[in-house]
Amino acid sequence: MRTNTTATVLLAAAVALLLATAARGDGGDGGCGKEDAAAGRDRARARGLKIAAFFSILVCGALGCGLPSLGRHVPALRPDGDVFFLVKAFAAGVILATGFIHILPDAFDNLTDDCLPAGGPWKEFPFAGFGAMVGAIGTLVVDTLATGYFTRALSKKDAATAAAVADEEKQSAAATQQHNHHHNHHVVGDGGGGGEEHEGQVHVHTHATHGHAHGSSALVAAVGEDDKETTLRHRVISQVLELGIVVHSVIIGISLGASQNPETIKPLVVALSFHQMFEGMGLGGCIVQAKFKVRSIVTMVLFFCLTTPVGIAVGVGISSVYNESSPTALVVEGILNSVAAGILIYMALVDLLAEDFMNPRVQSKGKLQLGINLAMLAGAGLMSMLAKWA
């Protein structure tokens, strides 16, 4: 899993570099959109708001991502508790609305913008919808291939362990039989009738214990195997979900950091803080269920919390050359947004909502089933309302 974290870091760096390079305005762009952008410019006020956004988004992301981990200390928030299902459903609704309401419309706007060349293909084909479809299908492929790969690797490891245990049991059984054979001969030599009775007792006791041990081992092995597969599934889900979040978080951060209009930044600070917190709740829930080691948990949480703030810092650094209305920037941002939307929509519907909604615990409790439906609608509704400001 460390390889996946490294890949996520490299992806974030590549997205930031790509946007920074693509957003440089050049003479061929005709200064499209620069007049509107210059209307409310105020560098001093904008800088203060960006600093506030940096820390606000960082803290809210940490709070959201850390909330599910409180289950270790608060019984109500344990992964197998009803409250945890409600929190995850709410967060999944937020992620679903993020894909449908926030990111996908932005992708359509970018790829149909008036600043794009009139003779280009961008207005003749719905590239934003196509990108979302590719993102969803790509996530499905990665999801299934990764799960299959790690499941096969786990099965091979378990098979090797089982073979080693079987060999050890055979050797132990052979040693026990040899010991019993020697002991029985010694007893028979001391007295005929008593020796036969004692030998029978040893024989019955050995087989009863042997059968009991094998029955318990089989039960423990079956439960352990199921738990391993579930944990493995959650690990794949958390890694893929973080990949989708990273792509659009970098874009959001760079766009906010490059803006010089305080009236544009001000509502974004509040909206993105809530957005980061709710999204963090969804990711944090997956991380807790994945049962990562402490080092991996800290790495994933820190990376999630820092992605948007670092994007803001990058945006501030390139603000003097950044032109979000340049054709190249519009195309790159639109494609990345559409793919990110497809990833998040797939993850929310398939890996988060469908999995929890079909969970036997939820299916057996009518009130919990109603509760997670309402929680999902609340999360999607609140995130949709934020689209008015962000």
Swiss-Prot record:
Protein name (database record): Zinc transporter 8
Record key words, sorted: Cell membrane, Glycoprotein, Ion transport, Membrane, Signal, Transmembrane, Transmembrane helix, Transport, Zinc, Zinc transport
Top-level taxon in the UniProt lineage: Eukaryota
Encoding gene (name): ZIP8
Membrane-spanning parts: 51-71, 83-103, 125-145, 236-256, 268-288, 297-317, 330-350, 370-390
Family: Belongs to the ZIP transporter (TC 2.A.5) family.
Parts of the chain on the Extracellular side: 26-50, 104-124, 257-267, 318-329
Any GO CC annotation of this UniProt entry: plasma membrane
Stretches assigned to the Cytoplasmic side: 72-82, 146-235, 289-296, 351-369
Glycan-bearing residues: N4, N110, N323
Source organism of the structure: Oryza sativa subsp. japonica
Entry's induction text: By zinc deficiency in roots and shoots.
Main location: membrane
Phosphoprotein as UniProt keyword: no
Presence of the UniProt keyword Repeat in the record: no
Membrane topology: Multi-pass membrane protein
